[in-house]
């Protein structure tokens, strides 16, 4: 009898032990990406392309975040900046629909697509990477922190059976919508608006507050044909005056801002291929103010019911009040019971207190700042600063669109000050509240994720617990290899001769672009075929060269000189190399440059004629190679030679 009892007890112990093992799955990877949204999926793909074992853990069944699961499938900005994985994704969108003209269906964007197509494309791109694993329907629960400040992994729970997943990683990327990983790990962050006195930004915020931007629960409507009535059941609390001022056809309360479009124009704002319409309308439409940041997952879900009801009331308004009865919730988009998006469109969450804080001044006047952060650029954007605050009367309503040119996001914005093992992406990077209004847009967030993937992969490969130890130039070099932009030049693309030289020299501050605020698509022009005077060229050299006694002498004599010629450029470049590169033989005579001219992709060698900026960039890159020779830190300051 005793033997039977002991055997039974042993079997019970084995059964319980087996259940515990099954209930808690443990994985070890090089790079863990928490969240498969816009930044998360590009971070995962890019890290895997660098041959490191990468895992993306995503809460939903979709990939792509705001581009797909949130339904914001009309991209904002970067039409002339098809950088890196954003450009690759867009090419796949073009291929799916039949070219750029087929996705220019609305007027808010140049690129519109169905959310489920975006999800399909991201899954196809992810499946092509052998070093990448995706796990769906696991919700982030907590970060694993060692010795108080090193993030070494994360814990998740399965949303279907509540089993646990524990992942240990050499590097963790926070690609969550609201910055949940850094909060769990105790990494310092900000929430809401900073006082103007704190940031030095001229936006007239008198005191720091915790106000974030409105969010939106997006719906995709489908045209079911004339005569078909798709009107939904009247939502509780419906009052058409809630949407007064959403369009000119329904504008009664003249104390509200006068709408700029009629209702027909409003509907086509984000018309998608397939006779579908995205609903993401800020002007008395379906925006809502909810601050979900400090809530539990269950509390967030409860609050989001309000956002869904806001959108349903707006849909009923369109159908019942404006007569668009033929437009109903698409039955072939989201795998949800209510046919709404899988997740909300979160415009803002926690913002990292990073190695640097990227502010409006760094964008509006990048060459005039104490720290030349543009030299550390890893992602580009060109959208204006766009804040949604109408649904929160406590929020300042005066911000508007601060005029800025296009910009480069600095690498230090992805890095915590003192915690190691963590890289921050998505909308959680270290930018001011104001700047978040432009860095939050889809193409920009995709590129932030790609840079995060490079940084984390390099840290894992080089066995660096702290990604801050990875060279800025090393990250930038790999991004260039991956066809990503460092500098936001609207007139220099991948097909432009000298693209890579221009990008490298621009990131050194040697030859500068001209910024131009421009409505919904800001610009920076490099003007590759333009010429410059000797003085204009030499006056930019101090931006590059920490040690050069010759510059002041050159500048004094240059005031009387005209346009910089090819021959004179070679002379200066020889002098630059000699004075900044110790123990280097200078052999770049005009004759030798002439023999290499065509090899470098140039034509019409004539020492007497004026040199173009493109040619000058190529000469500087090939002869001096300042991008490789001069290291920069996260502040953009040169640390060598």
Per-region residue spans from a language model:
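Bacterial N-terminal signal peptides that target proteins for export
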Residues: 1-9
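Bacterial N-terminal signal peptides
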Residues: 8-17
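Sec/Tat signal peptide C-region and signal peptidase I cleavage site
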Residues: 19-23
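Beta1/beta-strand and adjacent pyrophosphate-binding region of the FAD-binding site
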Residues: 25-37
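N-terminal Rossmann-fold NAD(P) dinucleotide-binding loop
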Residues: 40
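Conserved N-terminal/central alpha/beta ligand/cofactor-binding core
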Residues: 46, 52-53, 58-144, 149, ...
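Flavin (FAD/FMN)-binding glycine-rich loop and adjacent Rossmann-like elements that form
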Residues: 148-149, 153, 160-171, 175-478, ...
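Terminal recognition/anchoring or ligand-binding modules at protein termini
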Residues: 507-641
């Amino acid at each position: 009898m005793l033997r039977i009892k002991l055997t039974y007890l042993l079997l019970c112990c084995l059964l319980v032990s087996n259940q515990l093992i099954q209930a808690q799955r443990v994985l070890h990877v090089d790079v863990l990406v928490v969240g498969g949204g816009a930044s998360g999926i590009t971070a995962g793909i890019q890290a895997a392309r660098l041959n490191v074992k990468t895992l993306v853990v995503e809460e939903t069944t979709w990939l792509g975040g705001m581009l797909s699961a949130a339904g914001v499938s009309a991209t904002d900005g970067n039409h002339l900046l098809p950088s890196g994985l954003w450009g690759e994704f867009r090419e796949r969108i073009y291929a799916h629909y039949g070219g750029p003209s087929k996705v220019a269906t609305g007027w808010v964007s140049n690129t519109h697509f169905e959310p489920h197509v975006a999800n399909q494309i991201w899954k196809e791109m992810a499946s092509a990477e052998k070093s990448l694993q995706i796990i769906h329907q696991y919700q982030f629960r907590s970060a694993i922190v060692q010795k108080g400040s090193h993030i070494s992994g994360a814990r998740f729970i399965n949303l279907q059976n509540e089993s646990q997943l524990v992942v240990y990683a050499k590097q963790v990327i926070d690609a969550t919508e609201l910055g949940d990983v850094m909060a769990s790990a105790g990494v310092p962050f900000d929430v809401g608006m900073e006082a103007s006195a704190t940031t030095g930004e001229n936006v007239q915020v008198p005191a720091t507050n915790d106000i974030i931007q409105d969010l939106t629960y997006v719906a995709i409507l489908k045209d079911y044909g004339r005569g078909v009535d798709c009107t939904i059941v009247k939502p509780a609390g419906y009052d058409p005056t809630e949407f007064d001022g959403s369009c000119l056809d329904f504008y009664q309360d003249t104390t509200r801002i006068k709408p700029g479009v009629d209702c027909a124009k409003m509907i086509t704002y984000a018309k998608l291929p397939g006779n579908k319409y995205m609903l993401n309308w800020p002007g008395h439409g379906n925006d809502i103010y909810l601050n979900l940041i400090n809530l539990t997952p269950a509390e967030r879900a409860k609050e989001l019911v309000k956002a869904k009801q806001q959108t349903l009331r707006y849909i009923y308004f369109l159908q019942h009040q404006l007569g668009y009865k033929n437009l109903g919730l698409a039955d072939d988009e989201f795998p949800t019971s209510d046919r709404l998006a899988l997740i909300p469109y979160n415009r803002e969450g926690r913002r990292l207190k990073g190695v640097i804080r990227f502010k409006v001044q760094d964008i509006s006047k990048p060459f005039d700042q104490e720290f030349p952060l543009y030299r550390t650029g890893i992602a580009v954007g060109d959208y204006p600063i766009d804040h949604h605050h109408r649904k929160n009367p406590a929020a300042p309503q005066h911000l508007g669109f601060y005029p800025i040119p296009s910009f480069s996001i600095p690498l230090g914005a992805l890095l915590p000050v003192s915690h190691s093992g963590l890289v921050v992406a998505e909308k959680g990077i270290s930018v001011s509240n104001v700047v978040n209004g432009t860095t939050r847009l889809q193409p920009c967030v995709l590129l932030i994720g790609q840079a995060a993937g490079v940084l984390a992969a390099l840290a894992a490969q080089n066995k660096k617990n702290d990604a801050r130890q990875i060279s800025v130039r090393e990250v930038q070099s790999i991004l260039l290899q991956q066809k990503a932009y460092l500098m936001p030049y609207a007139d220099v693309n991948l097909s432009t001769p000298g693209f890579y030289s221009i990008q490298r020299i621009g990131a050194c501050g040697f030859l500068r672009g001209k910024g131009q605020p421009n409505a919904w698509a800001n610009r920076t022009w490099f003007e590759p075929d333009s010429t410059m005077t000797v003085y204009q060229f030499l006056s930019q050299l101090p931006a590059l060269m920490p040690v050069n006694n010759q510059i002041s002498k050159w500048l004094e004599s240059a005031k009387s000189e005209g346009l910089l010629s090819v021959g004179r450029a070679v002379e200066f470049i020889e002098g630059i190399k000699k004075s900044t590169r110790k123990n280097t033989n200078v052999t770049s005579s005009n004759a030798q440059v002439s023999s290499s001219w065509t090899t470098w992709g140039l034509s019409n060698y004539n020492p007497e004629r004026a040199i173009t900026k493109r040619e000058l960039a190529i000469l500087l890159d090939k002869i001096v190679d300042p991008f490789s020779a001069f290291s920069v830190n996260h502040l953009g300051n040169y640390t060598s030679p």
